[in-house]
């Protein structure tokens, strides 16, 4: 099965799930995780109709994104270190993994310098796993007002990865 066939299959599943849930399918964004895949594969995906791509490593994105011009739109989905924020602001249209007040401040600072507004998702560690990044829910609530007041960033929601379970309903 080629990428176009896979994409079509996934889109059909999304449509069916939206119909079951009474949700508008246009409200769902399919983000293809492109990490470790070469630019040629991303170009094939774009030709097949995929628009949004997620990268989790700044160095890989710096090498790949310039080789994928056109309709591709890029989101950062990995753990972001403060010293990589400048590059992230330059390369991406959204950062989906903001996990601290200090990181929020740095993104705001770099966005002000770049005259760019960055949509962000706040990463929440819902499982409470020490090995995972993200806010503890109580900590996020305590800092949210200050983060929301920072210039040049817009909180668009939360990003959370539930703990692994063999029972999908437990992950909801």
Which residues fall in each region the model found?
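Conserved alpha/beta-domain cores
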Residues: 1-172
